[in-house]
Amino acid sequence: MGQKIHPLGFRLGVTQEHLSNWFARPSRYSDLLEEDEKIRNCIKEYVRTHIRNSSNYGGISRVKIQRKTDLVQVDIHTGFPALLIEGRGKGLLVLKQSVLNSISTERKLKITLSEIDKYYAEANILAEYIALQLESRVAFRRTMKKAIQLAMEQGKVKGIKIQIAGRLNGAEIARIEWAREGRVPLQTLRACIDYCHYPAQTTYGVLGIKVWIFKGEE
């Protein structure tokens, strides 16, 4: 049953760190946790509606949130910071206002961008790339092969596994297909595993995409 556990939660405190860093009173904890989720969803929705179809779209790997007494700091790790700050920073201002509208807080909001050079070595970005290809009706085997090639070319990737489940290529019966290259040691705690589950909305229904990327051991 070891393979059933979430690869990131399994390694929290070992090779993974929390994406939300703050302290709160017990009575406020659930409200702030919900606020963090709203911030992340707002950023993803903004990117999906404004930037996702761009030819040089690089994706979002993770969103880190830190809270201080009078400040909420949001750090977006992305492969396309230039797209968010285009128009002399207007894109970032629009995003900031959109986030403020989605939450009710008296704290100041600060959004920073961290560029990822090898973004296809990030599970979230690679899973979103696969979803875009499947939604464009590209054959799933061709998509998996191309995604593995893109990831392995990044240099720091030691192994990768991709799994797609659903009505593949419009088949009547849903099934699961997967491909792997290199080592993906899910049982090794010191192994740096990046993982993402992402849904692809196709004309034949929803396809579930899972990506595991092994980046070495600590």
Swiss-Prot record:
InterPro entries: KH_dom-like_a/b, KH_dom_type_2, KH_sf_prok-type, Ribosomal_S3_C_sf, Ribosomal_uS3_bac-typ, Ribosomal_uS3_C, Ribosomal_uS3_CS. GO terms for cellular component: chloroplast; cytosolic small ribosomal subunit. The keyword rRNA-binding applies. PROSITE patterns: KH_TYPE_2, RIBOSOMAL_S3. Its main location: plastid. One of its GO terms (biological process) is translation. Disulfide bonds: none annotated. PANTHER family: 30S/40S RIBOSOMAL PROTEIN S3 (PTHR11760), SMALL RIBOSOMAL SUBUNIT PROTEIN US3C (PTHR11760:SF19). This is Small ribosomal subunit protein uS3c. It is found in: Plastid, Chloroplast. NCBIfam families: rpsC_bact. It comes from Spirogyra maxima. GO terms for molecular function: rRNA binding; structural constituent of ribosome. Keywords: Chloroplast, Plastid, Ribonucleoprotein, Ribosomal protein, RNA-binding, rRNA-binding. Belongs to the universal ribosomal protein uS3 family. Signal peptide: none annotated. Part of the 30S ribosomal subunit. Pfam families: Ribosomal_S3_C (PF00189). The keyword DNA-binding does not apply. Residues 47-117 form the KH type-2 domain.
